[in-house]
Amino acid sequence: MKLKGRVLKYGDNVDTDVIIPARYLNTSNPDELARHCMEDIDPDFASKVKDGDIIVAGKNFGSGSSREHAPLAIKSAGVSCVIAESFARIFYRNAINIGLPILECKDVTDRIEEGDLVEVDLNEGKIKLPEKNINIDSTPFPSFMQEIIKAGGLIEKIKGGIKHA
């Protein structure tokens, strides 16, 4: 799975409360979640994010309370992938379960800047910055996790398996 987009960059410890504030948890409407995604940390996020953009962040992305709304808001906003130095484990699992591609990459914030064009090969764990001639290696997901993401999430993967059974 290959993705390409411009970078929206954030620091360490971006928690689920700023990804989608608790005041919007009374809905699971993807469009509504997208409108309020990241608004407490980046009030202009909804107006500047473009389909295919990639979030790059520091350590412990998605920490805080467990809520599937957080990766759903990011995915619904049009973000194609989140690359972070590390993820909170519950966000990591929720992202995979809803089909949001994520990639862990040590020191990625030292090499990628806001607005950079990034190409990601999830199958190989490769990150390329073609305008800067930079290539970064990370650890790819195991194949079964890649299949879940490619299917659009765990539920879609299970539905697909039932159809072929």
Swiss-Prot record:
GO BP annotations listed: L-leucine biosynthetic process
Cleavable signal peptide: none
Entry-linked SUPFAM superfamilies: LeuD/IlvD-like
Catalysed transformations (reactions): (2R,3S)-3-isopropylmalate = (2S)-2-isopropylmalate
InterPro entries linked: Aconitase/3IPM_dehydase_swvl, AconitaseA/IPMdHydase_ssu_swvl, IPMI_Swivel, LeuD, LeuD/DmdB_bac, LeuD_type2/HacB/DmdB
Keywords: Amino-acid biosynthesis, Branched-chain amino acid biosynthesis, Leucine biosynthesis, Lyase
Presence of keyword Lyase: yes
Pathway: Amino-acid biosynthesis; L-leucine biosynthesis; L-leucine from 3-methyl-2-oxobutanoate: step 2/4
Top-level taxon of origin: Bacteria
Family matches, as PANTHER family: 3-ISOPROPYLMALATE DEHYDRATASE SMALL SUBUNIT 1, 3-ISOPROPYLMALATE DEHYDRATASE SMALL SUBUNIT 2-RELATED-RELATED
Official protein name in the record: 3-isopropylmalate dehydratase small subunit
Encoding gene, per UniProt annotation: leuD
